[in-house]
Amino acid sequence: MRKEKFAFYSFLILVTIVFELYMFLNRNAWSGLILVLVTAFIIRLYWKKTRKGGRAVIAMFILFALISFISLPKEKLVPATYEGANRTGKIKVKEGRLTGVYNKDGSVEVYAGIPYAKAPVGDLRWKEPKNPEKYKGVLRADHFQPMAMQKRTNRVVSSATDIFFYRNVTRTIKNRYVPKMSEDCLYLNICKPRGPQKKLPVVFYIHGGSLTTGQAWWEDYNGESYAKNDVIFVNFSYRLGALGFYADENLASESPNGTTGMYGFLDQLKALDWVRANIEKFGGDPDNITIAGESAGSSSVNAMCTSPLAKGKFKYAISESSSITAKKPPHSYMDIKTAIKQGKSLRDELGAKKPKDLRKLSAEDIANTNTKYGTLNAMTNDGYALTKSPYESYMAGENNEKALLTGYNKEDGDFFLLLESKTDKDNYADKIKKSYPKGYEEILKLYPAKTDEEAVKNFKIIYNAGTFGYGHDVWSRLASEREPVYRYYFTKENKSIGSNHTGELPYAYGNIGKAPYLYDGSDKKLCETMTSYWINFAKTGNPNGKGLPEWEPYNSGKVLELGSKIKMISDPNDKLYRIFDQE
């Protein structure tokens, strides 16, 4: 009897713990987690009284599953600062009057969820963004509006990742809900200093996410720190994936501009137009706008620097961890013929022939569809938004920015390598040859691999240099012929993700204080320095300032290492870049 009791209680405890952990990571309501514990106690009493273990186990699984279902996290809009925040006064823009909210210490005004275009739904799906409608009454800009339609990240995996890397643990504990997403997503957010101002510089930030995922309100690029330093910070959502970058000759025929495949990018330009037309009402200077972005947002900045539609609409550019200026960009860009071919594969997958057939489908079905070419997540030379590849535009001197701050992280590609096949000493040379058929022999001389450990280590270096560093190198070299270029190399390690992809964001935008348990005094000092560099650049086109280590322009041939030490160095991957030039 004792063995039977021990076995049942052990099984009950184990299953309860597994369900509790799953529901916690899945962000189920706290009431659901409590109810599971109560149910486990009742099951224990039932077994103790009846000794009917089979029935008890069946009842346990049925009840646990039912509780898990009825306590699923609800979708809701994310508050701009906090629930019940104090409201600002009214501001009048072209569409009407609106109010925002103050942050907790009252030093920053936040205006969230301002429509910059009509909802791209129904017949407006896959069309250039249209002007927003007039407001009915006063718009309450106090919550972030839905993020763009995209494939939902598995909540359990997402929360587990946050906890594993000690990122956003507080968010996982507090936020027992799911942020809303919708095809109706064309909204922007503005952070500004409290009270009236005039002619403040503006940072126009484009979020990343491979052009398929992401949202405008992520904590790492929250704009309050910039607003406290007299810079207005704007970010926004735009169409993603197939809804934003699907190319179809029939859609080009529908367009008065003959465009297709660039709807998400045209959203970005539309948001920029709205900011230029209205930012003076918030105290901003429409003639001193810096466009900024990370990852796919950085690729978008790169495209905006060469788009004829963006000419004269911004002044400076900040680019972090992605560039499409190489002759053969490894991601985020493809030629129009390839884009149209990829678009056809989407129609084949969904059983549609014409745009009208696709417009009848739900946004969820389209966003969740993979083609044989993968997801639709690349910009293209549509002849309207981009008339040439960025490389061709820079070669011709046809770029828009007056100064450029650009760089990447030491381990930018490490996460992406987890999706690659395993590298060892036996397949190392073949993998290098496949990626760099002209220069692989020189690469193998620079980075030979006699052991599996050497193969893994060296392949990471080569992958990071080729996938992330090289595009920034080409961009820097071409741009520096005509303008000041400031290039960085981020190497800081910490308790979180260190110098992996997105690792620089909380430093550059002044947000390490949102997760103080991840950072020490050296991180705080680096954050203060990087934020000062970025803000100075947004104000003047030069990151240097009083008390900061000198950041030499790239024409010196060096980059600024941002790590445990801040110093000018030669790019450690420069020899690889010269080999990549041959491809």
Q: Where do the model's predicted regions map?
A:
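Substrate-access "cap/lid" subdomains that shape
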Residues: 174, 277, 311, 320-430, ...
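Alpha/beta-hydrolase fold nucleophile elbow
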Residues: 282-295
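Non-catalytic accessory segments of hydrolases
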Residues: 2-251, 255-259, 521-530, 541-545
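Mobile gating loops/cap/lid regions near enzyme active sites that modulate substrate access
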Residues: 149, 166, 469-583
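Short glycine-enriched nucleophile-adjacent loop
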Residues: 298-310
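Active-site loop->helix "elbow" adjoining a glycine-rich segment at hydrolase catalytic centers
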Residues: 208, 263-267, 295-298
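Alpha/beta-hydrolase-fold catalytic nucleophile elbow
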Residues: 237, 292, 307, 318-321, ...
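Alpha/beta-hydrolase active-site loop
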Residues: 257-280, 337-341
